Amino acid sequence: MGFHQILVTVVALALASVRAEFPSRTDSPTDCPEADQGCWCRGSFAQCWRTYEEAGMTGEIGNRITKLDLLYQPSEEIVTYIRRSSAMRELRISEDGVSLDCSCDLIYALDDKHVTLVDQAELTFSNCQQRGWPRDSMTARSFVNRCHVSRMQDGDLRKRRESEDVDDDDVSKRASPRKGDEPAGHTLKDLAPQNTNHLVSIDGADKHPADELVNFISGHSPTRRATDNDAAVSDDSKRGARKKRYVNTMGYPQAMSPQMGGVNYGQPAQQGYGAQGMGGPVGGGPMGGPPQFGALPPGQADTDFGSSSSSVDGGDTTISARVMDDIKAVLGATKIDLPVDINDPYDLGLLLRHLRHHSNLLANIGDPAVREQVLSAMQEEEEEEEEDAATGAQQGVLNGNAPGQAGFGGGGGGGAMMSPQQMGGQPQGMIGQPQGMGFPHEGMGGPPQGMGMPHQGMGGPPQGMGMPPQGQPYGQGYLQG
């Protein structure tokens, strides 16, 4: 027999002898007469058969009792004895017809006070299924193990929740909506509307305090995001107005593009058409007709241009005082230090644009609901802008190639070169004599309407059916018309 086996045997015998030495009540007089109504004491051992209060136990007795034998006591009273006996180290529970409930509070009290339950093999716990356990009856040893596992799982869950609460405001661990990830925490649809907020107050119970701020930052219609008929948000920011940012090229409004007199602002006209991507024939519409401004009448051009640029300068999109107060309140809760004047519309636009393109800065907003809603709205706005850009580009190409429509800068008498179809023949390029040049020009018998004087802006004889004419300025007839 090896040394280790001998050591294990000695330890087992020692433990058995200790358990065998757990005392019992004798006929000797009690050492705690003040508690003789429910307890019997001898030295550091006590046996109690009534509740802690009925027995008259005191703190002095509890400070010297290290081994306790309890009879006929329910789980709640056993916990009371354990917590009020500071010196207790071993406990024996005698059922005697009293069933113990499957409550882990008893096991947790034993663990907290470092008390050993000496009769685990003989003790049973009943009515366990009523408390959610899989079996209705379990031995003390099995029940103690299950309670230990449950407590460790609860501790791990509590640590994870605390860690998540700490990490909620960590900007470095937050998913960025600009990368397509979902923002941390709840989504926008999970946020129930609230009537009050520690930052701002609102009138309606069915509207979140950040709704108008989100719509202002996003720059589109409130009907897209739960602001029904609020007069504080203008209708000029509808999705159709936003498309103009993507349909046009070179930054011009749709109805105010530069006149294409053939020179194409430094780009040579090729075969009677504008440069690739310009969206259709230069000149566009039939000869003799009035100039056409795309889908708008001529008088509406200036109005449309003014409305498309009024988001910062004022006009219909000027936000109300109540919305401005909400914006000030939300931005006041951030930790962003920028040299801007919140009352200056230009500075306010810069700040909101800065927040929009650096959305992680909004993580310092004090109200989690406002923060989540702003981040979600920004993500949705970017997706809509990408969709609008693709749709607007397709519509720009289609509208530019449509007959009678202005591909770039309006229809009517374009300057240097008409399209081959309007020259009276087929677009055959340089093959043979230009077809249609020998016939009377249809639609050009008199001074073309909208061109000022006959053939002004044509730039001399056509050279090469579409090569850039030489020498004369272009588009003068258009301007004079």
UniProtKB/Swiss-Prot annotation:
GO cellular component: acrosomal lumen
Disordered: annotated segments: 154-193, 219-243, 376-481
Location of region: Fucose-binding domain: 352-360
Annotated keywords: Cell adhesion, Cleavage on pair of basic residues, Cytoplasmic vesicle, Fertilization, Signal
Signal peptide: 1-20
One Pfam family named in its UniProt record: Bindin
Ranges annotated as biased composition (Low complexity): 417-440, 464-481
Gene Ontology BP terms: cell adhesion; fusion of sperm to egg plasma membrane involved in single fertilization
Composition bias type Gly residues, residue spans: 406-416
Biased composition (Acidic residues): 379-389
Location (main, coarse): cytoplasm
Positions with biased composition (Basic and acidic residues): 154-163, 178-189
InterPro entries assigned to the protein according to its UniProt record, in alphabetical order: Bindin
Function, as annotated: Species-specific sea urchin sperm protein required for adhesion of sperm to the egg surface during fertilization. Bindin coats the acrosomal process after it is externalized by the acrosome reaction. It binds to sulfated, fucose-containing polysaccharides on the vitelline layer receptor proteoglycans which cover the egg plasma membrane.
Family: Belongs to the bindin family.
Full protein name: Bindin
Species of provenance: Strongylocentrotus purpuratus (Purple sea urchin)
